[in-house]
Amino acid sequence: MNRLPSSASALACSAHALNLIEKRTLDHEEMKALNREVIEYFKEHVNPGFLEYRKSVTAGGDYGAVEWQAGGLNTLVDTQGQEFIDCLGGFGIFNVGHRNPVVVSAVQNQLAKQPLHSQELLDPLRAMLAKTVAALTPGKLKYSFFCNSGTESVEAALKLAKAYQSPRGKFTFIATSGAFHGKSLGALSATAKSTFRKPFMPLLPGFRHVPFGNIEAMRTALNECKKTGDDVAAVILEPIQGEGGVILPPPGYLTAVRKLCDEFGALMILDEVQTGMGRTGKMFACEHENVQPDILCLAKALGGGVMPIGATIATEEVFSVLFDNPFLHTTTFGGNPLACAAALATINVLLEQNLPAQAEQKGDMLLDGFRQLAREYPDLVQEARGKGMLMAIEFVDNEIGYNFASEMFRQRVLVAGTLNNAKTIRIEPPLTLTIEQCELVIKAAHKALAAMRVSVEEA
């Protein structure tokens, strides 16, 4: 039987939620009630699958851990008052920490004036952010399209490449094995995870995948496409594959891909949604090899963990295909004043506090600690790898990875797996993580692995 809509029920639900938003603290009974509500509503109205996922990576199979608020720049507090060091970072959005005061203040100040733009008058913050991004990014990148997420930034990049290359008879895209570029239809066509792709087949035509980090495979693909008349419009790849398991290519790989793109007249699209904004020890990961893409995709940390925003930045030559008709690709909320305020403040904090350099220093410290653990626990850990504050611990099988996440949860450290590699747990904390907190994370990992070894031996 169909359920009839109820205005009274919706009004009561919204009033209850607004009352909750106003609260700063909850007593014990309120916490228990909120936990029950959240679990019920996820099950009945969001997606029960999320509960099972959460259950697999929390202590004792308890999926009732409900986030309440930020504890500090680098910690989260749940409804039971437990504080966790955040080594997941919202999959890479909290580069400047949780509720960074500079970012929050910028958004609050803009909120007091005008939250969203009229769409008809020119909005100053979008102009200022575009100018700032042009100054920040490498090479000839000059014009920015702002959106709301990473997958949208990739969609814009693909459409931009198509618009530029179609008159030249180039329609093919080359992506890489293990890649993750998002889950909208175009971005999913470049993503290389069958689990995400198969339910939505057929995807966009013209996409080919080659092994990541294999420059000869890239050359062969470009050659074959040229021979068959399927000339390549663009190569799209991540400088370091995040969801693929924090996979680093061989030194010189990006430089070699850039040369191949120039040789074959293909555009180079770099997806720095996860690696950008200081995460790897440089503002952008491509700067480790001084590589300059034709199109750059940003999102996640660009909004400072306060507002969602993505960006697609291109050279004037490429972006000029949109000059005659700027409405060829637009979005209602992209580049809104609140998001632009957050992004401007985020860039300011990253530069003022030199957080990319801090990411390199602290990342080296953490990675040294994890590699030492890999040597101590070779029966459990296959490898620790990373660059800057984007790291991964790969285990000998999938189950051990899940167990490690659960044990770290018991140690009050949040970690999680990568979407394309179940054996791998990512370590992606805020760049503001303190040295003391870095040491606590390494100690927690040691305790987690020791407990896991005991469990294996007892079994």
Swiss-Prot record:
Keywords per UniProt: Aminotransferase, Pyridoxal phosphate, Transferase
EC annotation? 2.6.1.82, 2.6.1.29
Which Gene Ontology BP annotations are present?
Answer: L-lysine catabolic process; putrescine catabolic process
Q: Tell me if Cytoplasm is a UniProt keyword of this record.
A: no
Q: Which cofactor does it need?
A: pyridoxal 5'-phosphate
Reactions this protein catalyses: an alkane-alpha,omega-diamine + 2-oxoglutarate = an omega-aminoaldehyde + L-glutamate; putrescine + 2-oxoglutarate = 1-pyrroline + L-glutamate + H2O; cadaverine + 2-oxoglutarate = 5-aminopentanal + L-glutamate
Q: Which GO terms describe its molecular function?
A: diamine transaminase activity; identical protein binding; putrescine--2-oxoglutarate transaminase activity; pyridoxal phosphate binding
Which sequence positions carry the modification called N6-(pyridoxal phosphate)lysine? 300
So where does pyridoxal 5'-phosphate get bound?
150-151, 274, 332
Instruction: Tell whether Transferase is among the UniProt keywords.
Output: yes
UniProt xrefs under PROSITE patterns: AA_TRANSFER_CLASS_3
Which pathway is this protein assigned to? Answer: Amine and polyamine degradation; putrescine degradation; 4-aminobutanal from putrescine (transaminase route): step 1/1
Which InterPro entries does its entry note?
Aminotrans_3, Aminotrans_3_PPA_site, Class-III_PLP-dep_AT, Putrescine_aminotransferase, PyrdxlP-dep_Trfase, PyrdxlP-dep_Trfase_major, PyrdxlP-dep_Trfase_small
Give a short account of what the protein does: Catalyzes the aminotransferase reaction from putrescine to 2-oxoglutarate, leading to glutamate and 4-aminobutanal, which spontaneously cyclizes to form 1-pyrroline. This is the first step in one of two pathways for putrescine degradation, where putrescine is converted into 4-aminobutanoate (gamma-aminobutyrate or GABA) via 4-aminobutanal. Also functions as a cadaverine transaminase in a a L-lysine degradation pathway to succinate that proceeds via cadaverine, glutarate and L-2-hydroxyglutarate.
Q: What family does this chain come from, according to its entry? A: Belongs to the class-III pyridoxal-phosphate-dependent aminotransferase family. Putrescine aminotransferase subfamily.
Give the protein's recorded name.
Answer: Putrescine aminotransferase
